Amino acid sequence: MLERSLIGRESEPTTHEVEKGAIRRFAEAIGDPNPLALDEAAARAAGFSGLVAPPTFAFTLGWSERFRHSLDLGTRSVLHGEQSFEYARPIVAGDRLTVRSKVADVLERAGASGPMDVLVIEDEGRGEKGDLVFKVRSTFILRRG
């Protein structure tokens, strides 16, 4: 059982240089045909300084391996339950973003195969000047046992 005392625990900040190759590969992997994520000329023609990341790209920047390990989740099965995104502006190739993750909530739910834990993580990404770029709220379901 996850302890509610985890609520409020924050990760160390991690800084990411957003690369155009990462944006392009992500767009291709999810089948996003948006030329702003695939074609630099199209992105520049639309007024951006580089490729524009698809909306769900921010998830790849948060919830670091080190933070997951610090929560001591063990080897339980983890199911991605829900996700929401808020953007102050698009993520663009060349951005240098600092991301922090925080445990927003820990809940217990009854499942068909027994009790399970629900873990809610909030990621926040900020630009080099400290400006908010995005927030991601993710819900994970963890089977016990």
Residue ranges and their predicted role:
Residues 1-82:
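Hot-dog-fold acyl-thioester-processing enzymes
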Residues 1-2, 90-145:
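HotDog/MaoC-like acyl-thioester-processing domains
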Residues 17, 84-86, 139-141:
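Generic structural detector for well-ordered beta-strands
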Residues 44-45, 53, 80, 87, ...:
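Short, surface-exposed, polar/charged, turn-prone segments marking secondary-structure boundaries
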Residues 58, 65-66, 86, 92, ...:
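A short acidic, glycine/proline-enriched capping/turn motif at secondary-structure boundaries
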Residues 71-95, 99:
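Mid-chain, well-packed structural core segment of small domains
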